[in-house]
Amino acid sequence: MTRAILPDVSPDSIDPQFLEEKYDQERLKRINAAGYAKYSEVGDGELERFKVTHRLEDVASSREPVSVDTDVVIIGAGYAGILTAVRLVQNGILNFRIVEKGNGFGGTWYWNQYPGAQCDVESYIYMPLLEETGYVPTERYARGPEILKHINLIAKKWELAPKTHFQSEVSAADWTADRWTVKTRQGDEFRSRYLVTAIGPFHRPKLPGVPGINSFKGNTFHSSGWDYEASGGSATEKLTKFSDKTIGIIGTGATAVQMLPFVANSAKEVLVFQRTPAPVNVRNNGPTPPDFAKFLEPGWQLRRMDNFNKIYTGEPIDTSIVSEEWLSATLQVLFGTESDKPSDPAELEQLLARTDFQVMERIRRRVDETIKDPVTREQLKPWYATICKRPCFHDEYLECFNRPNVRLVDTDGKGVDRITEDSVVVDGKEHHVDALVFCTGFEYLSGVDRHGGFTVTGKDGVTLTERWTPGPSTYHGLYVHGFPNFFCLQTAQAGTNPNFMYTATTGSTQIGHVIAECLKDGVREVQPTKQAEDDWVKMILEGGRGMMHLMRNCTPGYMNNDGNLDEKTARRMFYPGGPTAWRKLLEAWREKGDFEGLQRTY
């Protein structure tokens, strides 16, 4: 297969003044000081219809509540949760339980079964434990059903099903009398010495706060609750019930980019409602070579993950193991070696801007070369910096807009006006649709308790929400002062990049080690010291403020908390050294063996 590449762009063809003015113009169109207030929560009040229930069997209401005493409770049975469980088993800990809201393993991949769903980083670095399971992904970018199959393969290999309680939705977790008590809405109660929240970053869907959203009479759902009863077909089969219908898709982020080609192949007509165009790079997906695993040496997956990390952050590498389109010259400048960077901050910022103008111009040139209609062509061009949005990669998305049955409805940055019983209104004009799909994403930077929809109460009756009122406070991005024996696998203040599986792999290894050592040594309580947590947060804030300065001219989106670049957002940023440095820091911490920064009580 011939590899696609982005068009070349000469630096001499770039007009920095024009681009600065254009970026600012597009940003100002989209500014909304309300931030999350412009979104509505799935399942709130009149939006109960958007709550996903069709993947839950009616067994939770009929079964008897369970009461369990155990050493460890893990909340969440997605990749993060089962990775934590595997680490416990590898450390000889077998007395644990997993508590999961859904009716199966999978987490994000259990709920997000929309057509076209795929991982958007390489399967070989996204799907964990490939060496341990001997599994080889069939494609460079695996599709949802295959990923779900792999998750269940892990659960089977480590015999996790007997230790997992499905359809058990946590309502509260309280620290009392040296134990955590976890209660569910089904009346269950789990008492444990240690608690791990592993609910992942894409758990709480959001809908646009559009007037009339509940008045629509046709089938409508959020992408994370795709209803195949309404559409027909499956994640891999044609959507037969859409064949005579006009389908509206609101949103043009990573989910819509994956979904549109599949829906366009099934529906009579598709209307795509766009606030901000996505930056769509080439993907070059294809089958895994037959001899892929033949020459791999032990430790290959971690090396490949680290190679991606370095490519993404622009660190020097000997060779690119990951043939990866995530490579960005802008990020190389931002994270490269000190000898490569101007020492003056103003000069560095200018260099970043010049470099990024060229990177994004290549994305826009791809639109020029792909889209036939001149108006649609201009509307699909992203006018912002690389750092502003999660990059998208697809080989068919842009081509869809050349199809006669696909029409872009650009809102010029304003979003839709309102929704009626059979239409979406943009700039006063009604656009009739038979079904409406919201690809409007998730709350990404909210806290663990809000993500999960349950309260976490630590010592002295203080909730995590109260403790994190100024923003997250952690040590290593994993533990919280005042919350003994509590661990959270999350993105805030941890080593994170677009491959969340690296964060989950690294964090679960650390959590498994700490719990195992504490159980072995008879530790009653373990938590970070206030000083260790304060020092970690100070470091995060310093890096976070720098990142927010670079994002100040971005259009609103989840990467910049919808334009709310305040101190609270800075505390939600990531370990500034990058994910590989975070892993090495934790490895050195374990090797040292003195539990630096953690206070252990016997």
Swiss-Prot record:
Belongs to the FAD-binding monooxygenase family. NADP(+) binds at residues 118-120, 252-258, 275-276. Its cofactor is FAD. It is an enzyme of class 1 (oxidoreductase). Hypothemycin is an antifungal agent that exhibits excellent activity against Peronophythora litchii, which could be helpful for the storage of harvest litchi fruit. Hypothemycin is a strong inhibitor of a subset of MAP kinases such as human ERK2. It can therefore be used as an anti-cancer drug thanks to its inhibitory activity of Ras-mediated cellular signals. It can also inhibit Trypanosoma brucei kinase TbCLK1 which is a good candidate as a therapeutic target for African trypanosomiasis. Finally, hypothemycin also has inhibitor activity of T cell activation. FAD-binding monooxygenase; part of the gene cluster that mediates the biosynthesis of hypothemycin, a resorcylic acid lactone (RAL) that irreversibly inhibits a subset of protein kinases with a conserved cysteine in the ATP binding site such as human ERK2. The first step is performed by both PKSs hmp3 and hmp8 and leads to the production of 7',8'-dehydrozearalenol (DHZ). The highly reducing PKS hpm8 synthesizes the reduced hexaketide (7S,11S,2E,8E)-7,11-dihydroxy-dodeca-2,8-dienoate, which is transferred downstream to the non-reducing PKS hpm3. Keywords: FAD, Flavoprotein, Monooxygenase, NADP, Oxidoreductase. Pfam families: Pyr_redox_3. Binds 1 FAD per subunit. Pathway: Secondary metabolite biosynthesis. This is FAD-binding monooxygenase hmp7. PANTHER family: BLR3857 PROTEIN, L-ORNITHINE N(5)-MONOOXYGENASE-RELATED. Its EC number is 1.14.13.-. FAD binds at residues 108-111, 120-121, 126. One of its GO terms (molecular function) is monooxygenase activity. The record marks 390 as: Transition state stabilizer.
